[in-house]
Design a protein with these regions (language model features):
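Short, acidic, small-residue-rich periplasmic hinge/interaction motif at the N-terminus
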Residues: 19-54
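N-terminal periplasmic accessory domains that precede
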Residues: 35, 61-64, 83-85, 109, ...
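Extracytoplasmic beta-strand/coil segments of soluble accessory domains associated
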Residues: 66-115
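Short acidic/polar hinge/loop motifs at secondary-structure boundaries
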Residues: 113-144
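Face-selective signature of the C-terminal outer-membrane beta-barrel domain
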Residues: 223-241, 254-427
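Structural signature of Gram-negative outer-membrane beta-barrels, strongest in the C-terminal barrel
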Residues: 391-530, 534-539
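Gram-negative outer-membrane beta-barrel transporters
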Residues: 407-410, 539, 557-708
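C-terminal beta-signal and adjacent terminal beta-strands/loops
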Residues: 542, 696-747, 757-760, 766-816
Length: 816
């Protein structure tokens, strides 16, 4: 029906581009924007004004990605972690999911302050989990998909700039409800002086199932005009808590908690001098506490445990056969950052202008958490030790940039250079220099409204190693050397463990991961149509991964004593029974030790398109079509050891193979996707109604796993080592040696087949209804037609159901 009505309105002269026809009865509903805007500035940027956020009803910032070209709908809800990233093939088994790894390289700024999560270790909630950043306070968002300004750094994916309400906030409240999720918000602004200094207060709460989060935000804004020069000072404090319970039964339950506290002090002075137009200073701080408490029953029978952290042979605790343990993980990452910016501009003749900006920042971050702790008499497992994060050194980051913009009526160019470095104990200075360039050239313009513009950009962006990459956890391998337990005599037992503690293996050559971007685009405009098309290429090198080294060690295995009423004892490094030493054999084994490496390489290329067909007047319906063609190739060249667990005459297999493949079937993943969104936007100002019907289509989706560009059903190692620890190249002769036969890695051939699915789509609807100037009621429904086709996956030989389940919600906003 909608398509029929739309086609019936396609009559010459019945549509307007970018505007509504006059409506004398419209007195409270402006021509609001409900989609992302592609602004006319250098770079590839999407703007999301307040009206778009109110109409779209995103639950977290991760939902904003669906407004980008070719963006896909997420299954709304907060029971699972949310992550923000752009230009990623986030489909998995035909369902759109969040791309966790790419989210680490997305930089988020709130009112000019970046959020950093580089000091989190073993957290139950990752710092960049979008559920802990409220969108209720956000009034405008800007997403930089291409090459960002030189001011923004420590990223490899994108920049998300969030702006909160400026000035005095009206009394506002909103209630969002659906069968699973509930959200509440209340905010109010106050004038606290005759000079219109303001104080804004906001509180919100979100709940779904066992997950709960809520927070408050206080924002002060002061401004003066000393000697006629503008001076502003803003003070912001944000506190947020989160809590979740997973109760299986009385013997298995987990509780997670998180507390975020952030403050920001920003000052800006505009002396309006020739060489100094603006001077600003920012001081930020953040303290986060994440805690997970897990209680579970250990049903293992009579295990041995020691908490020694040195290599050697130790008398161990004999654990009970059945006991309840409690494992606590506490992480307290924090950072303090300061930044100073200066800028000026010089007007030239004929509407030309040159602007200059420079800045310097310093950040110190660490983790003061208790780490992992538990009762030593009731450990969660063997070969586990307590670990305090307070022992880990701090990270210190230094950044500086300079940037210049030259602008004429038809041409803009922005060029900048950024340099950032990271210093920590035990590591040399890690640094990276990043040149960046963006330009926009309007090379054709006619009086009748026809325009053609060219945009292009090239630049480097990089992401520094995080605390957990630089200081990985120490590894402990415990082997049972002797165990005696007299079932007829309680307490007559003795256990001896040999601990191999190779410690941490640090990669002192660890570098920052670098993404080199290049893009070019064309913008065409007519009085009734606008097209924005961007082609891009991204090559990310030195991505972070982990490589397992296998370190051999020897241990003693004492003879088994089956006779009862013996009383063995351990003294002078030997087990004794009745004054005689118990015989033993020398055995060999390996300890896998993970090492951070720069072996992940990603290449992305594709085309983004946004076409605005203007407004069809009779129906007051506009059509915007956006889409993306995206290809992603990811390869990990890490050398990983694999030790076949085989025994011959009760002796462990003596060789370890080293392969250029990961734990899966191969070392390379390729994926390709073509998706579009047809957004039909209808505005009826007389009754204050705006509706958006989105037809989302995935025309092409395919992915494949490869081994070095081909299949890898049978893969021999590149290197091998024995119990002497010496690594040797693997030769053709050894392939014929039966002793090395267990090192052949085999994979089913179908695991390397290409998975490709027929086109499929879904229908989403958004409805906003204004009641006067102060009340707004909004409704949304995702996949309301329940389009969930079944497709066959060749690589797994299984059938998969595409698309998310139907999901809907309702929101009421009141502003006074």
């Amino acid at each position: 029906m909608t398509i029929f009505l739309l086609l019936s309105s396609l009559h010459p002269g019945n549509y307007l581009y970018g505007q509504e026809q006059p409506d004398t009865l419209s007195f409270y509903l402006p021509n609001i924007l409900v989609t992302a805007i592609e602004p006319k500035i250098p770079g590839t940027v999407s703007l999301l004004p307040a009206s778009t956020l109110e109409h779209t009803q995103p639950i977290t910032i991760a939902d904003l990605a669906q407004l980008l070209p070719g963006g896909l709908t997420n299954n709304s809800g907060v029971t699972d972690a949310h992550y923000f990233s752009v230009r990623e093939v986030s489909l998995k088994n035909g369902v759109n999911q969040f791309h966790k790894n790419a989210a680490m390289g997305a930089q988020i700024w709130v009112d000019g302050s970046p959020l950093h999560f580089n000091a989190g270790i073993n957290e139950p909630y990752e710092g960049y989990d979008a559920r802990f950043l409220s969108l209720n306070q956000v009034k405008e968002a800007e997403i930089i998909r291409g090459i960002p300004s030189a001011r923004y750094g420590n990223l490899t994916n994108s920049v998300l700039l969030l702006k909160t309400h400026q000035g005095r906030m009206p009394l506002s409240t909103s209630i969002r409800y659906n069968p699973k999720l509930k959200q509440y918000m209340l905010g109010k602004g106050f004038c606290i002086s005759p000079q219109d200094h303001t104080l804004n207060l906001l509180a919100d709460y979100t709940s779904q199932g066992d997950f709960h989060t809520g927070g408050i935000r206080l924002a002060n804004l002061y401004h003066w005009l000393p000697a006629g020069k503008k001076l502003e000072l803003s003070l912001t404090y944000t506190s947020r808590i989160g809590k979740e319970k997973q109760f299986v039964n009385e013997q298995n339950h987990t509780q997670r908690q998180r507390l975020d506290q952030r403050f920001s002090i920003q000052g800006e002075w505009q002396p309006d001098r020739r060489w100094l137009k603006k001077l600003s200073l920012r001081i930020d701080g953040s303290l986060q506490k994440s805690k997970q408490t897990k209680s579970q029953v250990n049903n293992a029978s009579s295990q041995l445990y020691t908490d020694r952290k040195e290599s050697g042979e130790w008398e161990a605790h004999v654990l009970s056969s059945n006991y309840m343990y409690t494992l606590v993980n506490e992480s307290r990452p924090f950072y303090v950052e300061t930044e100073m910016l200066v800028s000026t501009f010089f007007p030239l003749r004929q509407g030309r202008e040159i602007s200059l900006a420079a800045g310097f920042s310093y950040r110190s971050e660490g983790n003061e958490g208790r780490g992992r702790d538990f009762d030593r008499q009731r450990p969660p497992s063997t070969s586990i030790r307590p670990r305090s994060f307070r022992e880990i050194p701090f990270l210190h980051t230094f950044c500086g940039f300079i940037e210049s913009t030259y602008q004429t009526p038809n041409f803009q160019i922005e060029a900048g250079l950024r340099h950032q470095g990271l210093k920590s104990r035990d590591y040399a200075f890690i640094y990276q220099t990043e040149p960046r360039l963006n330009l926009l050239w309007s090379f054709f313009s006619s009086p009748s409204g026809y325009k053609l513009s060219l945009k292009a950009g090239v630049g480097w962006i990089s992401f520094m190693p995080t605390l957990d990459k630089l200081y990985q956890e120490s590894v402990y391998n415990d082997k049972v050397s002797f165990y005696y337990n007299d079932r007829n005599e309680s307490g007559n037992s003795l256990g001896i463990l040999t601990t191999h503690a190779p410690g941490r293996v640090r990669n002192i050559e660890l570098k920052s991961t670098v993404n080199r971007k290049i893009e070019a685009g064309l913008i065409g405009e007519t009085p009734t149509f606008r097209l924005d098309m961007t082609a891009f290429l991204e090559k990310q090198t030195n991505g972070f991964s982990s490589s397992e080294q296998y370190i051999p060690f020897s241990y003693r295995e004492y003879d088994y004593l089956s006779t009862t009423q013996l009383h063995p004892e351990y003294r002078d490094g030997q087990v004794w029974v009745n004054g005689e030493a118990v015989p033993f054999q020398e055995k060999y084994s390996y300890t896998p030790v993970p090492v951070s490496v720069n072996t992940l390489h990603r290449e992305k290329h594709g085309v983004e398109i946004v076409a605005d067909f203007g407004t069809f007047a009779p129906l007051r319906t506009s059509l915007i079509v956006d889409g993306i063609w995206l290809c992603v190739r990811e390869k990990n060249t890490a050398l990983n050891g694999i030790w076949p667990i085989q025994y011959t005459d009760k002796t462990e297999y003596p060789y370890v193979g080293f392969y250029d493949k990961q734990g899966g079937p191969g070392n390379e993943n390729r994926s390709e996707m073509i998706s579009t969104n047809f957004r039909f936007i209808t505005r009826i100002p007389r009754i204050g109604l705006v509706t958006t019907l989105t037809w989302q289509m995935i025309w092409l989706y395919r992915y494949r796993t490869l081994y070095n560009g081909s299949t890898g059903e049978n893969v021999w190692p590149l290197y091998w080592c024995g119990t002497d620890g010496i690594i040797h190249p693997f030769t053709e002769a050894q392939k014929e040696d039966p002793a090395f036969a267990p090192l052949l890695s085999t994979t089913a051939p179908e695991r390397f087949l290409s998975n490709s699915y027929k086109p499929y789509g879904m229908l989403n609807i958004r409805v906003s209804k204004a009641f006067g100037e102060h009340i707004m009621l909004a409704f949304f429904a995702n996949n309301f037609a329940d389009l969930r086709p079944t497709r066959y996956s060749a690589s797994t030989r299984s059938y998969l159901q595409q698309n998310t389940q139907p999901f809907f919600g309702l929101e009421l906003q009141i502003k006074l």
